[in-house]
Amino acid sequence: LFPYTTLFRSRAEVADVANAIYDGTDAIMLSGETAAGKYPVDALKMMADIAEMTEPHLDYKVFIEHRSMDGREKISSAVALATVRTAKNLKANAIVTPTMSGNTARLISNFRPKVPIYAITPNSTIQHKLQLIWGVTPLKGYQRDTTDHIMSQAMNVVRSRHLIHKGDLVVFTAGDPATNMTNGRGAVTNMMHVIEAE
């Protein structure tokens, strides 16, 4: 985003970074020229400072009220939106989602919940990709199994890392392996549970 020949930033460059944040971008990055230029560390620090100064001014209600649901994935998007609204209404401590593809965590992130999103996946590649998604903490764990076992395994992962504690309210969402194939379109996120951590 920044030119590499000067330490000073123009108003347009600052606005580009701020607008990316206002647009809900999950990650921003420097161009190759900047990263290899005279001041790569200073440019990165400046970009991070702009992002950190911009984020507190976002109206997160806008993300819930005005983000449209993905047309290809209306069922999953509707469940993701319901998950975020439920977490807000109940003042939940976290959202937990076991995921094979990372899609559920990405959909939930689109609505910018104020609670952490813990995405539990057995797939290392998906875990690494989810590190770039806003608000998502990807964790390794769980194996394909019945819905009850997947929920139990995912809760054990977040509990063992002390991310949730006894009495915390957790909104749990995933695709139920027994019922999540819809009209030949593949797996969808189709369930949500509210659980009090034991």
Per-segment meaning from a language model:
Residues 22-27, 48-60, 84, 88-92, ...:
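Generic secondary-structure signature for well-ordered alpha-helical cores
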Residues 20, 108, 170:
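Conserved, mostly hydrophobic/aromatic
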Residues 17-40:
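Glycine-rich phosphate-binding active-site loops on the catalytic face of alpha/beta enzymes
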